[in-house]
Amino acid sequence: MWFLILFPALSLGGIDAAPPLQSRVVGGFNCEKNSQPWQVAVYYQKEHICGGVLLDRNWVLTAAHCYVDQYEVWLGKNKLFQEEPSAQHRLVSKSFPHPGFNMSLLMLQTTPPGADFSNDLMLLRLSKPADITDVVKPIALPTKEPKPGSTCLASGWGSITPTRWQKSDDLQCVFITLLPNENCAKVYLQKVTDVMLCAGEMGGGKDTCAGDSGGPLICDGILQGTTSNGPEPCGKPGVPAIYTNLIKFNSWIKDTMMKNA
């Protein structure tokens, strides 16, 4: 499972975690400039570690397995390694991992059969509100269930090579298909639950990977998921990736944001 490559030490505040392999949008393309204004780049000690989604001026949604002891984020970026006048840098004042996510699983070197990675969500409260512009815009939470067969767009920055840590400078996009959860349940030893989504291409070659964790999955124009975990190597035929099913968490997200405004 690829997110464990990135976070066995880093996830709980360690500082010596090795960089991940196989960590990229697979089979994707350069996103059209400023086409994903809700896309967030999450950093730890100046290193890009995860993606995220801007929900409003004060809050970013990402994956719970991206948990570290301090964060900073960039909003409105297209190029990971270049300065962009329109991009905005923010520190994070506090993080709120979903209380139902089992953090202890991140310390394991292998995934035990039946492991449950449900609730892989975390909210980040920005230390200063984002300025809403043409290139920095929030995206709304879903109001209806996603439908299998929908065309989905995932995005993120990550390695463009399979065996060494060479990140893409350009934000990458990839079109994948939302599949019935049974397609994932058949090929994963871990639990596949109703708070997860299964998406990819059964023929392989198009996928998200560890560097994309926490980034958006937009199906038929609606934010429906965030990247959670998937096969290693990424894009493996017959093995779609797993995303968090956001409509199952609307209440928790809204309540957490309201109580910690």
From Swiss-Prot:
Disulfide bonding pattern of the chain: 31-173, 50-66, 152-219, 184-198, 209-234
A molecular-function term among this protein's GO annotations: peptidase activity
SUPFAM superfamilies xrefs: Trypsin-like serine proteases
Swiss-Prot/TrEMBL catalytic activity: Preferential cleavage of Arg-|-Xaa bonds in small molecule substrates. Highly selective action to release kallidin (lysyl-bradykinin) from kininogen involves hydrolysis of Met-|-Xaa or Leu-|-Xaa
Signal peptide start-end: 1-18
Keyword Glycoprotein: yes
Any GO CC annotation of this UniProt entry: extracellular space
One of the GO biological process terms: zymogen activation
Entry-linked Gene3D superfamilies: Trypsin-like serine proteases
EC category name: hydrolase
List of glycosylated residues: 102
Limits of the Peptidase S1 domain: 25-258
Prosegment location in residue numbers: 19-24
EC number: 3.4.21.35
PROSITE patterns listed in its UniProt record: TRYPSIN_DOM (PS50240), TRYPSIN_HIS (PS00134), TRYPSIN_SER (PS00135)
Coiled coil: none
Protease listed as a keyword: yes
Keywords for the protein's UniProt record, in alphabetical order: Disulfide bond, Glycoprotein, Hydrolase, Protease, Serine protease, Signal, Zymogen
Residue numbers annotated as active site: 65, 120, 213
Similarity annotation: Belongs to the peptidase S1 family. Kallikrein subfamily.
Function: Glandular kallikreins cleave Met-Lys and Arg-Ser bonds in kininogen to release Lys-bradykinin. Prorenin-converting enzyme cleaves mouse REN-2 prorenin at a dibasic site to yield mature renin.
The name this protein goes by in its record: Kallikrein 1-related peptidase b26
Species in which this protein is naturally found: Mus musculus
Gene that produces this protein: Klk1b26
